Amino acid sequence: MALRSAAGRLASSSRRRLLSPPTSIHTAFLHSHATSFGYKQVAEEDKSKLVGNVFSSVASSYDLMNDLMSVGLHRLWKDRLISKLNPFPGMKHLDVAGGTGDVAFRALERINSVSHRAMQGTLTDIEEETQIYVCDINPNMLNVGKKRASERGYKEGHCLSWIQGDAEALSFEDGSMDGYTIAFGIRNVTHIEKALSEAYRVLKRGGRFLCLELSHVDVPLFKEIYDVYSFSVIPAVGELVAGDRQSYQYLVESIRRFPNQEKFAQMIQEAGFERVEYENLVGGVVAIHSGLKL
């Protein structure tokens, strides 16, 4: 309750929808982030390896660091993401860059809660058809997720599958998913536009795209405080807890290099999604973008 109370005091939420469509959804993307690794410029073919090194380094302490950096608020942000997804029994859902399982576990818990209320605890055929796919390019992150799943009693292949894969070249069939989520992952891909295109491809008509990402603060005074916290405190905590200052320095820099809320919403729209909107949380520290494939 204290955490939710704190979130209520801190959260400055707003929802915005892009009302005017782009000139053409087939227009080539004008912004490429292929050569940025934080504030550094790197060869396009090197970025994936560099990002992989970051997450291999922080995998074992990833969830603990999320708690420390966000003062636990990331849990509420992910709850909000799942609330907007509104998962249902029998759905096929893809969670990309979700290696440690945080989003997938929440989706399954929500589905089980809905099912049990409706069926009074009876497992139905449609529940058995529910499948959540966790896709992550980093095997170390997936191993953390698999261990957590085992501790929660989830058997691999029964409602929950772990796939090592690239957000820019997914192995799933066209129109095979009811939902797609990506939390704190899309800013790390080499080509954001390719990841969005793949998300659009694998979704069914009527499928929902949702992205939870650290974004750009839109409250001037809070922005100054947040900048000091980001560049001074987060890397220091990373060094103290994870023994890795540089990875968390990259984290902070990658947030600043990521497109702002309006630009990213435009990119989602250009990928073909409709009814694109976003919701700022905690004054824009994070934003949840959503869109539908119609």
Curated annotation (Swiss-Prot):
GO terms for biological process: methylation; ubiquinone biosynthetic process. InterPro entries: SAM-dependent_MTases_sf, UbiE/COQ5_MeTrFase, UbiE/COQ5_MeTrFase_CS. The gene is COQ5. Keywords: Membrane, Methyltransferase, Mitochondrion, Mitochondrion inner membrane, S-adenosyl-L-methionine, Transferase, Transit peptide, Ubiquinone biosynthesis. Belongs to the class I-like SAM-binding methyltransferase superfamily. MenG/UbiE family. PANTHER family: 2-METHOXY-6-POLYPRENYL-1,4-BENZOQUINOL METHYLASE, MITOCHONDRIAL, METHYLTRANSFERASE. Component of a multi-subunit COQ enzyme complex. It comes from the Eukaryota. Methyltransferase required for the conversion of 2-polyprenyl-6-methoxy-1,4-benzoquinol (DDMQH2) to 2-polyprenyl-3-methyl-6-methoxy-1,4-benzoquinol (DMQH2). One of its GO terms (cellular component) is extrinsic component of mitochondrial inner membrane. Its EC number is 2.1.1.201. GO terms for molecular function: 2-methoxy-6-polyprenyl-1,4-benzoquinol methyltransferase activity. It catalyses: a 2-methoxy-6-(all-trans-polyprenyl)benzene-1,4-diol + S-adenosyl-L-methionine = a 5-methoxy-2-methyl-3-(all-trans-polyprenyl)benzene-1,4-diol + S-adenosyl-L-homocysteine + H(+). CDD domains: AdoMet_MTases. S-adenosyl-L-methionine binds at residues 100, 136, 166-167. This is 2-methoxy-6-polyprenyl-1,4-benzoquinol methylase, mitochondrial. Pathway: Cofactor biosynthesis; ubiquinone biosynthesis. It is a peripheral membrane protein. Residues 1-10 form a transit peptide. SUPFAM superfamilies: S-adenosyl-L-methionine-dependent methyltransferases (SSF53335). It comes from Oryza sativa subsp. japonica (Rice).
